């Protein structure tokens, strides 16, 4: 196998976040899969976690109309404080037992409602100014319980590498995954989320290597800021304005994809055992700007980012599928 499935965070593609605009933009680009995060189904912009049953039903109908399916739930699970201490941030603390019983179950409900097997999540905010390494044991315990909850419902929890969280590098995320030791927890590579912390291209590649034993899928965005000079301890919102397409940044995507091409059969076998047929490259471009709980690209920016990704895939020889006339003919036959 040397092919991947292209997907994307659809909310980045629409100025209004309206569902039909999101799906129209992605369908025009050629995508058939998307990750759901924020959406307006007629009652204002909402996170997927707080959608009403009627809104879910409307989205299910729109999926059929636009030929879209959900690759993952872009949940905010794990983007809360690990400890109930004041650290100068606005991050919330929720007692873990309550979080596991309520928020995690809602995320699982959404995955079942949208017939997908994957939940995206995070590794908790340690107190600002403390070392993330000191919190790996507690995070691993909590994420282990989240993985068990997902596994009971036939789902897989994907842990995204991101700044300011305990799992802010590939090495830390790999250590967490090793401690959890549950196939229901996999890791998500995101090169830009490490370049923004001051890692070089060579260092990002090393972080990708560290994640391979636990890797589940990849988020695709890139980052380039000539003013970066060494490691950044805490990333602020002002840093989120230097995202670029995958063929223009410092995340070593070409080198990573060269390796991924040979690793895909192993990775596909791993995810197939979890009921996931194929390896997703999930576009999350942020090319008009990013933030703590998402980013924005616009329909033009999303298309630019998608074409940038495809150029890198073409160069290294990894196959992918964009909508064809045959797909259109098949859709017409189904709607007849």
Predicted segments — roles?
Residues 35-36, 70-75, 116-123, 155-160, ...:
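Short beta-strand segments at enzyme active-site cores
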Residues 20, 24-25, 65, 81-187, ...:
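Active-site acidic/histidine proton-transfer and metal-coordination neighborhood
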Residues 40-53, 77-101, 123-135, 233-244, ...:
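Surface-exposed, active-site-proximal loop segments in enzymatic domains
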Residues 9-13, 37-41, 75-78, 124-126, ...:
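Active-site beta-loop-alpha junctions enriched in small/polar residues
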Residues 53-75, 137-153, 179-180, 251-258:
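Alpha-helix-loop-beta-strand connector modules within alpha/beta enzyme cores
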Residues 2-7, 15-32, 64, 170-336:
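Histidine-acidic metal/acid-base catalytic patches
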Residues 9-11, 25, 29-53, 74:
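N-terminal substrate-binding region of glycoside hydrolase catalytic domains
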């Amino acid at each position: 196998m040397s092919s991947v499935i292209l997907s994307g965070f659809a909310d980045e593609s629409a100025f209004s976040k309206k569902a039909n605009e999101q799906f129209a933009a992605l369908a025009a680009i050629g995508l058939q899969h998307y990750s759901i995060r924020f959406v307006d189904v007629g009652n204002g912009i909402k996170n997927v976690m707080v959608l009403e049953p009627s809104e879910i039903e409307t989205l299910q109908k729109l999926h059929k109309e636009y030929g879209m399916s959900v690759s993952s739930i872009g949940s905010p699970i794990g983007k809360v404080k690990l400890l109930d201490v004041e650290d100068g941030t606005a991050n919330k603390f929720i007692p873990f037992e309550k979080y596991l019983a309520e928020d995690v179950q809602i995320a699982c409900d959404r995955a079942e409602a949208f017939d997908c097997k994957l939940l995206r999540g995070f590794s908790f905010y340690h107190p600002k100014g403390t070392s993330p390494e000191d919190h790996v044991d507690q995070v691993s315990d909590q994420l282990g319980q989240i993985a068990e909850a997902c596994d009971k419902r036939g789902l897989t929890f994907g842990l995204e590498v991101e700044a300011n969280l305990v799992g802010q590098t590939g090495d830390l995320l790999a250590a967490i995954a090793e401690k959890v030791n549950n196939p229901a927890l996999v890791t998500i590579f995101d090169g830009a989320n490490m370049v923004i912390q001051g890692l070089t291209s060579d260092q990002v590649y090393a972080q990708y290597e560290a994640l391979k034993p636990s890797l589940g899928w990849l988020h695709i965005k890139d980052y380039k800021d000539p003013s970066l000079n060494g490691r950044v301890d805490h990333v602020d919102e002002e840093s989120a304005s230097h995202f670029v397409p995958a063929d223009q940044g410092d995340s070593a995507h070409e080198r990573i994809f060269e390796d991924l091409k040979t690793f895909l059969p192993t990775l596909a076998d791993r995810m197939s055992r979890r009921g996931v047929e194929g390896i997703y490259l999930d576009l999350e471009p942020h090319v008009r700007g990013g933030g703590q709980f998402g980013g924005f690209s616009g329909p033009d920016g999303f298309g630019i980012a998608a074409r940038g990704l495809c150029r890198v895939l073409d160069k290294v020889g990894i196959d992918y599928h964009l909508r064809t006339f045959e797909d259109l003919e098949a859709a017409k036959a189904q709607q007849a």
